[in-house]
């Protein structure tokens, strides 16, 4: 992250934490000759460091009878940062709503207005497409090394595809990565979300500290069986 110090100098005030300028409209031609990957890595490093400071501060308030954390805001979708933060080991439990950005805040507003807790059971709150989930058809296509598009049941509330509006593929074989990216028309560095039975997850992945499962695609995890 070669531009990390430049970002702090030009954009971030650390004590007290604040941005030196409004960045919602972008950064213009700042560092116009920078390699985009270097720039992205630097922004990620600064983000993780700033969030770490905030989490440490939050943990100081958590000792008053509750050591759990509810984490929200658009930055809570940053899976790489979430792994770093969880590995700090500051909280017993961490909960992130599947739609932690502005749209998800609407649920909090409703709960606050009604003065009631939300009975959260699942993230499938959107439009419903009726019918049986096509398990056998999906298995058949995956065995033939094909990609499968699924649109069944109620849509996920949030930006993550969690099974009801999803593209599924067999992860075995390097060519599948390029095929998924081609169909989605996205960059080659984009991440993928594995789906695995909860009881088998520790056999294949090294989850962050305190994370027993991640059903809403909120953390990165190291694969423990090589490349």
Predicted regions and their residues:
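Short, surface-exposed alpha-helical recognition segments that flank or form part
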Residues: 31-46
């Amino acid at each position: 992250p070669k531009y990390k110090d430049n970002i702090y100098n030009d954009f971030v005030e650390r004590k007290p934490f604040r941005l030196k300028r409004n960045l919602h409209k972008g950064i213009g031609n700042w560092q116009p000759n920078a390699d985009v990957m270097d720039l992205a890595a630097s922004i990620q490093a600064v983000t993780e460091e700033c969030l770490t400071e905030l989490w440490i501060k939050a943990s100081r308030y958590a000792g008053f009878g509750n050591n759990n954390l509810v984490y929200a805001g658009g930055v809570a979708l940053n899976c790489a940062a979430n792994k770093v933060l969880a590995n700090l080991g500051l909280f017993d439990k961490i909960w992130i709503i599947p739609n932690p950005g502005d749209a998800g805040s609407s649920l909090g507003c409703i709960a606050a207005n009604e003065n009631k807790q939300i009975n959260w059971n699942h993230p499938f709150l959107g439009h419903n497409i009726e019918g049986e989930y096509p398990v056998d058809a999906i298995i058949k296509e995956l065995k033939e090394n094909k990609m499968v598009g699924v649109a069944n049941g109620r849509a996920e509330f949030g930006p993550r595809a969690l099974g009801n509006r999803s593209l599924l593929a067999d992860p075995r074989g390097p060519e599948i990565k390029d095929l998924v990216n081609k169909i989605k028309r996205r960059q080659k560095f984009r991440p993928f979300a594995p789906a695995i039975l909860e009881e088998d997850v520790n056999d294949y992945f090294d989850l962050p500290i305190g994370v027993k499962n991640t059903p809403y695609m909120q953390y990165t995890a190291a694969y423990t069986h090589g490349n």
